[in-house]
Amino acid sequence: MKLYHSNLNKKSRITRDPVAVSPVNELTALDPKQLKFQIAAALRIQNDYYPCFDWAFPPPITQKTPGSPAPQTLFRHPSVVPGRYSVYLHTPFCQSLCKFCYYPVIPGQQAGEMERYVEYLTREMALYAPELANDRCESVYVGGGTPTYLTPALLEKLLTSIHRHFRLTDDAEVTIESAPGTIPRDKIALLKEFGVNRLSYGIQTLDSALLATLNRDYSVSAAVRELEDAVAIIGNVNIDTMYGFDGESDDALHETLSTFVALGIPCVSIYALDGQRRNREIVRFEPSKDPYYERKIRIFRDARAFLTGQGFEPVLQNIFLQPARASYRHQLRRWNNVTLVALGMSSTGYAPRRIYQNHLSLKNYYAHIDEGKLPILESEEISQEIEIMREAVSQLRFTQVDLARLNEKYGVNLGAVFQDLIEALTELGYLQSEGRVLRLTDKAAPYNNIIPMLFAPDTLKAVIFGLPEEYRENFPLPHVLTQIGATQSAAMNPGGH
């Protein structure tokens, strides 16, 4: 059994994990009169425009604390969304390894290992259950891997265990990921019977020639039949599409989307293929230039225009749905700092003011559970300041941020804290506002991995100077942040209104 996984930073690049040490320089002081010109100059770069979820705030650059905290330690801070939590559960098994995949997966038949893994998942749930007994779970996301590669009996055991250990709300959203060839009609019916009310289907493209180059061995016509059954039985169905393949025509994504719209698919996710990730032998600091950069931007903009013209609304940067027929509460609620319980090998979770990740190997994952411990590899406790900006920055990156609501929730006036930055970005055409609601403009889209990060507290920006020099110089995000320097107009004072 071989586990496939690459260590990645959060910029769509394969690299060693950079860790900041003591900063070597001080952050340049804010000059309100020059800020607009500094931003304009710093953004004259080719950014990595890849619509994906591999963006995170705070960026993973600080030293983590190894070891597994006890549940009461993990949840020692009060939640800013009291009484509610979500669950992410990772199942690493897949029928085969797709050439574009970079997640921790175990391809091929592993029947015995699957049974063992599901058993350990139920034991991990039991470790969390007492600490969460008085709270309600509002969403569950079963990802992978391909969870529907599990047998019907194992899926039934897994879903039953979720309902047994966690108190789901009456309207809880329960999502499971799937792939072509893994959900015959009777399995879809079983999923619905045991509470699944949202299905995400990773089909990527309907171009058979492209599929053959990706190690995706399935019949397009059979996949379409599975989707028709899923829409008929579950209804709330998302399909993952991808573009940027070698030999792909400019119209390939549009043709794929047109077919799905005609099939009545109510939710569509769009991702761009990154050639760097496909080469598992490359480990480098410096990102190469993407010769198809402008083409990818054009294809994505055309796809967005097509979907919005068909009645779809963007709920995240790259996810579009028909509001009356689909929802995606789990992902949206992540950016409200709701507690996210991470289950399974390699899963990443969020306890109040603590980001954590489970062990990356089955051996260590099993060993910790055998010892009665949470299988946590490492964690990072964050300050209240970072917690506030985690919500604000993430919401700006993916949807929009309501400064009035955050002021009410945290007692901090971010409009005053970042007054000069907001004015500069607005004058440059990167930011627009309706009342106290801020959102990125279309002009900002190619820089949506960077512009929201300008709202990071200056204390966090200063940490970037502790990164290796080649990382600071060659990657867009640290390069821009160190060039611009401080962006806070005032100190943050949580609770002060």
Question: Which stretches of residues belong to each language-model region?
Answer:
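Flexible, acidic/Gly-rich N-terminal and inter-domain linker regions that tether
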Residues: 1-85, 428, 466-468, 474-494
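C-terminal scaffold of the Radical SAM
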Residues: 8-14, 18-21, 77, 107-131, ...
